[in-house]
Amino acid sequence: MPSAQPLKNGFIRTARYDAGMTNRLFALFTLLCLSPFALAALPLQPATKPAVEPTSKESKPEVHGDDKLSITHHEIKTAGQILKYEATAGTMAMKDEAGKARANFFFVAYRKESGESFDPAKRPITFVFNGGPGAAAVWLHLGAVGPKSMKLDDAGVPTGPPHALIDNPNTWLDATDMVLIDPVNTGYSRAAEGVKPEEFFGVDRDVQTVGEFIRLYLTRYDRWLSPKFLAGESYGTTRAAGLSEHLLNHGIDLNGIIFISSVLDFATISQGGSNDLPFILFLPSYTSTAAHHKKLDAELMKDRSKTQAEVQNWAVTEYASALARGDTLKGDDRAAVVKKLARYTSLSEDIVDKANLRIAPSYFEKQLLGDGRRIVGRFDARLIGVDPQPLSEDPAFDPSFSYYLPAYTSTMTAYAHRVLKFESDLPYESLAGGRVQPWSLGREGQGFLDVAPTLARAMRENPKMKVMFASGYTDLATPYFATDYTISHMNLSADLRKNVSRMMYEGGHMMYHVRESLEKLHADVAGFIGAAMPAAE
């Protein structure tokens, strides 16, 4: 089983499977995956009009059986039209076969209101979650998909404190109803009294419990006949791949899955031992990052598409061959690789040579800008921070993560209480850190965690299911070329490959922090869902 060590920003770093370290996996994502903070709600930012407009209708919190729910009604202007919707925020009780409570899942569901009688067969529903493990759905919820979003400045960074909540004209609600799911010990979700939270911590356990939530929701809200989609980010894509087969085995066939900043095969991102694959697959993202910071030579800066294609080809040919030679690569052959790798990363030949041709992401983040004090982000390498320890090997923090966590937590807490009318004194766990450890892989002795074969089986058994992969060019957590590699190694037939959509965006792991990418992601998802819907009779 692979073990993993948490990075400072919470993203998982897997190493070779070691029987003595089996149950020490993933201390969260990101993203995302992404040190938990139990932050109190901050006031929403004043504006010329209320940051949160009054709802058209409100209801007091209701209790249905063991479920605590708050149902409110709202409207938003998108694409020049008024979209009315119902929001349900609350907890759903999950019980065992004996009727004993096991957990209370917090969720927020959005349903478009059309004024007509509701026909579930005509309205798709998408179940959305983030990753970690240990991340609540707030990142996608208030960053990309929900009808409200956290206000960002022109650089894609939170404006506060205090933080503002604004309308999101790029909400996915115009294309699909949505259910945002917080797994146990994230958000407001908790294990029931007397139940150990550890019972939910693991690859298989997580798939089973989130899958059971989805089944219960479909039943309780009469959505079995709706076209059904999943959307996951970061480790959430690992979960989504597992769910693709789990749900199918339980009579739930999906129309499509949206994978955002995906990691399905952990061998593609996990440096360690003799695994050279990540060094090959991270390289194009290094080049994209160096280009963004204008560190590449003039020739490479002329045409990014041409440069990226050139680097990708070199990575899987000359570079891969050179790494495969190991210590036998010497003399002029080694010198040629050092020179090319230095050119494509903008690092010095001396650094490349001393790194033995293998540049770890953390080292690249530290060295790219030249002095060790200015560092680039891991989740988005466009962003720059100042490291207080310039001589250390790894960055002290991730500027593309630390700027966001308090903002998302406080904004979501205020949104849940003030707008969705869900009352809870629990801290909203945007990123639960050690609260989901240890994370069981449940696959002892089987090498790196790899759920790509699981997804491939589901695609063969459900050949109408479509999949979409979305990646950012400057993501140094789940690099885009690793996703390309995984897709091309799923052994899909030509017909099934037609069901795969591949999308690229400016930005990093949370590419939706870039306004243009947020708009493009919205359009791409709407088109994807429309194409995956059954043909009208």
Go through each PLM region and give its residues:
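N-terminal cap/lid subdomain of alpha/beta-hydrolase-fold enzymes
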Residues: 42, 47-59, 99-199, 488
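A catalytic-pocket lid/entrance helix-loop region that shapes and gates access to the active site
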Residues: 147-151, 247-343
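Catalytic histidine-centered segment of alpha/beta-hydrolase-like enzymes
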Residues: 506-517
